[in-house]
Amino acid sequence: MFDIGVNLTSSQFVKDHDEVVARAYAAGVNGLLLTGTNLYESQQAQRLAQHYPHCWSTAGVHPHDSSEWRADTGEAIVALAALPEVVAIGECGLDFNRNFSTPQAQEHAFEAQLRIAAELQMPVFMHCRDAHTRFLALLDPWLDKLPGAVLHCFTGTRQEMQECLERGLYIGITGWVCDERRGLALRELLPLIPTEKLLIETDAPYLLPRDLSPKPASRRNEPAYLPHILQRIAHWRGEDPQQLAAATDANAEKLFGITLKSA
């Protein structure tokens, strides 16, 4: 099973990268996509992906960091994207929940990265929170120019999911769905996702599954907990976990153009 969303550049992992990756593989995870959220972390993610087997990375600027976008940022992302470990542009998109960067800065950076992805014919790894209508308005003109796109860590409504699926987007599901307080609505939507459009992720070190037992003392999420998330998703979808793991692996291979080792 492949984890499409690992923030291995997080300071929470700085002391034990080796152990985190080793635990993931020992747990049955067969690959990791390391997310880049700004230029520096995209460079870090690429170096980590180069260092560890069965790891790839993204290159991009998260909406929170969009105020950092400069005239030469796009050129730097293009240069990173030429490296073999980098398989997607992002994490990019819109986040109007906290507006760490202004909406205008977010939209500018998002459109610039959609343009880069289209020019390079690379998939986009996207983020959207409290910005669905504007997100789709910016994305729509590029959809027929992109080879593929995933909306990671989906936590939206039924209508929002349907509108994403109608556009052919892949949907990334995290341990958010394991939260009996916040995740119930999303849990009910799981059967609506076509198997061929589902991807799974931890978003580690964030979003530790609330129903994980025992929980780590650190309360830090890790890619080693992806099997737990997969099991729960399969249960709520009424599917066999092994078959779902194989299907989501095939989806990741198709979207990102990678080859995963057999389980």
UniProtKB/Swiss-Prot annotation:
Disulphide linkage map: none
Entry binding sites for a divalent metal cation: E91, H127, H152
HAMAP family cross-referenced by the UniProt entry: TatD_exonuclease
Quaternary structure (record): Monomer.
Subcellular location(s) per record: Cytoplasm
Cofactor list: Mg(2+)
Functional note: 3'-5' exonuclease that prefers single-stranded DNA and RNA. May play a role in the H(2)O(2)-induced DNA damage repair.
Protein EC: 3.1.11.-, 3.1.13.-
Single GO MF descriptor: magnesium ion binding
Keyword Magnesium applies: yes
Keywords attached to this entry: Cytoplasm, Exonuclease, Hydrolase, Magnesium, Metal-binding, Nuclease
InterPro entries: DNase_TatD-rel_CS (IPR018228), Exonuc_TatD (IPR024918), Metal_Hydrolase (IPR032466), TatD-like (IPR001130), TatD-type_Hydrolase (IPR050891)
Principal location: cytoplasm
Family note: Belongs to the metallo-dependent hydrolases superfamily. TatD-type hydrolase family. TatD subfamily.
Full protein name: 3'-5' ssDNA/RNA exonuclease TatD
Pfam families (alphabetical): TatD_DNase
Gene3D superfamilies (alphabetical): Metal-dependent hydrolases
UniProt-listed CDD domains: TatD_DNAse
One cellular component (GO) term of this entry: cytoplasm
